[in-house]
Amino acid sequence: MNHPTLHNPSLSTKFIQIQGVEQTFTTTKGLFPALRDINLNIARGEFVSLIGHSGCGKSTLLNLIAGLTTPTAGNLLCANKEIKGPGPERAVVFQNHSLLPWLTCHANVHLAVERVFGKQETKAQLQARTAAALELVGLSHAAHKRPGEISGGMKQRVGIARALSMEPQVLLMDEPFGALDALTRAKLQDELLDIVARTRSTVVMVTHDVDEAVLLSDQIVMLTNGPAATIGEVLKVPLARPRNRVALAEDRDYQHCRKAVIDFLYTRQGHVEKAA
């Protein structure tokens, strides 16, 4: 049996590099240190989950990788290029799907396709890209429906299609399934496993769900409580792919990984009120 191992981030292949990153925000009460001394390397094609209690800076770290905010100190690199702002090589999927309600699902995805590929491809090629992205998430049948005409799970799949349509090197997901019911969430998790296997995308995902993190991830990055949160541990998940949630339910390696994350969150980082 392969026991879960605590993994030294500095030994990873360096596709995404986070070097000594700190993030401080100015508030009405003064400076708030959100993150301190974040060091992490992520390999190409790796699925990494960021997990920790509310307020530990998970979304802040994801926004830094996305280039939506600039670090107070330190550097972030993707494919050896400094991250200085948003870019099509890093696509973001938020918990709120952020679809334009007056446009169809096809049109919402097509906007992203046109922005990235509009100057070098024909209209037919752009339409083909849009259709392929919707097909990838199983929504070809809903292409001409508007967001108000489809379910919450389908809306989130449109958001994923929009992100993947840009052929990003990195897919960044901020609690993408957090607002969905348990059955829909499980279905989309399984679909995401299949999509990532086919696209070989590098994924960084924020989650509060321990089982979701273990099921999907190659590495689980556990953040300490804020303020001044940092990386407490990085857990390497030794589960072979493809993964099946039913088979994993009684898998000893799965249970060991789950226990390791729960122990970190609720035994070693359990005093959230004192940290807030």
Name these PLM-found stretches.
Residues 165-169:
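A short, proline-enriched helix->beta-strand linker immediately N-terminal to the Walker B motif
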Residues 66:
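Helix-to-loop junction immediately C-terminal to a conserved catalytic motif
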Residues 11-15, 24-37:
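A short, flexible loop at the N-terminus of ABC-type nucleotide-binding domains that lies
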Residues 74-86, 122:
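Conserved ABC transporter NBD signature motif
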Residues 51-53:
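The feature captures the beta-strand-to-loop junction immediately N-terminal to the Walker
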Residues 103-112:
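Short coil-to-helix segment of the ABC ATPase nucleotide-binding domain corresponding to the Q-loop/switch region
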Residues 146-150, 154:
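Conserved ABC ATPase signature
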Residues 114, 121-141, 194:
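Conserved ABC ATPase "signature" region
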